[in-house]
């Protein structure tokens, strides 16, 4: 069975992305393009923003052989290069659509 990892992109401040600067907007566009490419390559199952009442954060689910591989892939994320931080959490999957 494949290994799955929940990845959270921590926002730089609680008001983000509502008050993004032009530079941050450029970074986030590049970030979205990077995650789209990771999805095309089969590493990412799903990704996008989570809209919390007091904050918004990014999330994605990776399929990879190890947590170390996820961190290697995240090193090239433009958001990471711009100084934003990620959290990586291993997941235990109850079921995946299409596999049951």
Positions of predicted regions on the chain:
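Conserved, structured core segments of small domains
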Residues: 1-100
